[in-house]
């Protein structure tokens, strides 16, 4: 019998005591039961359908027992699959298998520790002691590294870099082009002048 049902039965049998307040009235149905001598022997029974399965299920999951899973209904198994983000369709055996594999994988993942590299803190306020010898060695080392890296890089030469001076054939071509342009320029004004016949 649930508590709400018990409250209804008691309120029907007893009218209750009226608790008076300023402009308010409240009936307390259980106060008469407390004043009766046999009222302390009231027992309540909770049936299986009214218990919460989530607390039991989490206890069973922690113990990794497979057999108690089979006692749950398909509806409860689907709720558990939904809470874990698993597929909801299938038979009861499929749901059981998904829950068992998911829990075994999650237990393995929680047991494996991920070692993250510790971040080094750089304190800006602390002065750094550098000797002149260290600075001079460092500059020579960096210069040597730069020179060696420049020597190792491939040199890409453009045609202008390869042939920076004019070849004799280029000189002949440019001289000929210049002379033809001058001749053509001199011939053009003579053709455009009107001829006067006397």
From Swiss-Prot:
Query: InterPro entries recorded for this chain?
Result: SAP_dom, SAP_dom_sf
Location(s), subcellular: Mitochondrion membrane
* Gene Ontology cellular component annotations, sorted alphabetically: mitochondrial membrane
Family of this protein: Belongs to the AIM34 family.
Q: Where is the SAP domain?
A: 69-103
Q: Where in the sequence is the transit peptide found? A: 1-55
Say if the entry is tagged with keyword Methyltransferase: no
SMART domains tied to this protein = SAP
Q: What is the lineage of its organism?
A: Eukaryota, Fungi, Dikarya, Ascomycota, Saccharomycotina
Pfam families reported in the protein's UniProt record? SAP (PF02037)
Protein name, entry field: Altered inheritance of mitochondria protein 34, mitochondrial
Give the superkingdom in one word: Eukaryota
User: Transmembrane ranges?
Assistant: 172-187
Q: Where primarily located?
A: mitochondrion
Keyword Protease present in the record's keywords: the answer is no
The membrane-topology field of this record reads:
Single-pass membrane protein
Keywords tagged on the record: Membrane, Mitochondrion, Transit peptide, Transmembrane, Transmembrane helix
């Amino acid at each position: 019998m649930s508590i709400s049902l018990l409250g209804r039965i008691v309120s029907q049998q007893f009218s209750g005591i009226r608790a008076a307040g300023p402009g308010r009235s409240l009936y307390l149905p259980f106060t008469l039961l407390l004043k009766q001598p046999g009222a302390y022997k009231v027992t309540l029974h909770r049936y299986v359908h009214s218990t919460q399965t989530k607390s039991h299920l989490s206890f069973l999951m922690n113990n990794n027992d497979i057999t108690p899973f089979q006692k749950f209904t398909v509806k409860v198994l689907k709720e558990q699959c939904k809470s874990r983000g698993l597929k909801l369709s299938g038979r009861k055996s499929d749901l059981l298998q998904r829950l068992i594999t998911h829990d075994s994988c999650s237990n393995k993942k929680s047991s494996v520790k991920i070692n993250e590299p510790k971040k080094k803190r750089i304190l800006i306020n602390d002065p750094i002691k550098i000797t002149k010898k260290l600075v001079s060695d460092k500059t020579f080392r960096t210069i040597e590294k730069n020179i060696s890296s420049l020597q190792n890089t491939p040199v890409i030469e453009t045609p202008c870099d390869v042939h920076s001076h004019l070849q004799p054939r280029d000189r002949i071509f440019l001289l000929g082009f210049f002379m033809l342009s001058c001749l053509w320029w001199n011939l053009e004004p003579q053709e455009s002048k009107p001829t006067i016949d006397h």
